[in-house]
Amino acid sequence: MKQLKIGNVTLPNRYILGPMAGVTDLPFRVLCKEQGAGLLCMEMVSAKAILYNNKNTESLLEIHPDEQPVSLQFFGSDPKIMSEMAKRVEERPFDIMDINMGCPVPKVVRNGEGSALMKNPKLVYEIVSAMVKAIDKPVTVKIRKGFDDSCINAGEIAKIIEEAGAAAVAVHGRTREQYYSGQADWDIIRQVKEAVSIPVIGNGDVTSPQKAEELVKQTGCDGIMIARGAQGNPWIFSEMITYEETGTLPERPGKEEVRDMMLRHARLQLKYKGEFIGIREMRKHVAWYTKGLKGSAKLREEINRVESYQELEELLFQRL
């Protein structure tokens, strides 16, 4: 099993759960860890929200003792605030600090944050170097192919990130303009790999063990980041590990296994978020878990009326 070293942190394997707002919360990360994910990326956290002691941010910062190694992702555009807030949270039990330079969401981009930073190489350097100087933990950065077709500069930005002292860079093979549409351009990941000597983590359209193998062959990347490919599919990590070790694909989980995983996920949601929020958040997860299963469209419709764990359990046992 190939390991991956990021700064002074050694990951047990190269398969990384990518950060997804509203998805990679503590309950989901625990499930992915149990399936063997080598690194778990938390939901992005606003550096300004930490500065202003936003109460909702505290729950985003919660880490389970069993989930290391884990990466905490900041977003922002002010080097001073970002570095000072990184220092403020450094004592928490995360292993790696990541900087979000890939988020395509309009309200983030309008503030000059997320993927908007791809248009400002000078500020990229200032943010990364300030963060690296502020904390002892490794700093990584997640970027995109570029902002749009007129600004494809992942290679240039990756070099700046390396010069500023980052320990690794993750590259999503789409521009901000593309969001998640079309196909990810893996060739840009190869170009970044050739441009820098720090580890490069490839991201985009990795939905199976074969795709992960293909990504490594095409790009030479050091790590593989799985984001949407893990939605409703925490098994993807154990499947990738088995495939790397044996060259064979394990059987996909059957209906009963999917149902058991959903109920375990729901119990974790309730434990950390209470029934009201936990059950509502499970609705989207159930839609992902059951995608492609017979009768899943009807189930998704019914799930939106479920208000309690008991109702969820009864419905899943009826339908699956």
Question: What is each stretch, according to the model?
Answer:
Residues 1-3, 11, 15, 21, ...:
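Alpha/beta catalytic cores of nucleotide-metabolism and tRNA/nucleoside-modifying enzymes
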Residues 20, 45-47, 75-77, 102-104, ...:
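Active-site beta-loop-alpha junctions enriched in small/polar residues
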Residues 15-19, 40-42, 70-74, 97, ...:
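Hydrophobic faces of well-ordered beta-strands that scaffold small-molecule active sites
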Residues 118:
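Aromatic- and acidic-residue-enriched carbohydrate-binding clefts of CAZyme catalytic domains
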Residues 51-56, 109-112, 152-153, 181-184, ...:
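Short secondary-structure transition/capping segments
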Residues 1-5, 20-95:
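Glycine-rich, positively charged N-terminal anion/phosphate-binding segment
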Residues 2-16, 50-70, 103, 107-111, ...:
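N-terminal small/glycine-rich loop or linker at the start of catalytic domains
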Residues 83-113, 122-198:
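Alpha/beta enzyme core
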